[in-house]
């Protein structure tokens, strides 16, 4: 079963907190409730625009992947051997409806997915690379052939929204 966890940026100090999410009765303030290193339960007011839910997945470095994170995916050597090309994809972790390959072979789903920002051909340089819009329910395949790495998030790194990482 997936761990239900939220992340939000505190209103006052702009620091990130992870824990349970709740809202004031007046619905004007969101709070993240968390445990300190000493086991005390604390709550902090967070900016509602920064709240994102944990996907239940980890990136290749063991970091928790949250809604709003920006991911880099690069083909593995194993993939490159079989397919004779390499590429990188950059995208935003989202939750909602997505339509993968709208033709008869495609499918539509509701869940975690990666919204494409940019795709870059590494080898050969001029290879035409399409965007990958994948559901995170395919994480076993994604991690085997193009592992995910968090390179930032939409709140702290808006410059990455212009197309992912460096050229």
Predicted regions located by residue number:
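Secondary-structure transition motif
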Residues: 1-167
């Amino acid at each position: 079963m997936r761990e239900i966890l939220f992340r939000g940026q505190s209103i006052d100090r702009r620091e990130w907190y992870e824990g349970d999410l709740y809202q004031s009765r007046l619905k004007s303030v969101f709070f993240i409730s968390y445990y300190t290193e000493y086991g005390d339960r604390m709550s902090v007011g967070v900016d509602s625009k920064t709240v994102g839910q944990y996907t239940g997945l980890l990136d290749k470095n063991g970091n928790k992947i949250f809604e709003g994170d920006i991911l880099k995916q690069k083909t593995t050597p194993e993939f490159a051997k079989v397919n004779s090309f390499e590429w990188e994809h950059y995208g935003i972790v989202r939750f909602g409806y997505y339509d993968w390959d709208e033709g008869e072979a495609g499918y539509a789903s509701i869940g975690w997915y990666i919204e494409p920002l940019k795709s870059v051909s590494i080898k050969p340089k001029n290879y035409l690379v399409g965007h990958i819009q994948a559901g995170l329910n395919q994480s076993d395949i994604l991690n085997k052939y193009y592992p995910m790495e968090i390179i930032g998030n939409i709140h702290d790194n808006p410059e990455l929204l212009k197309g992912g990482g460096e050229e």
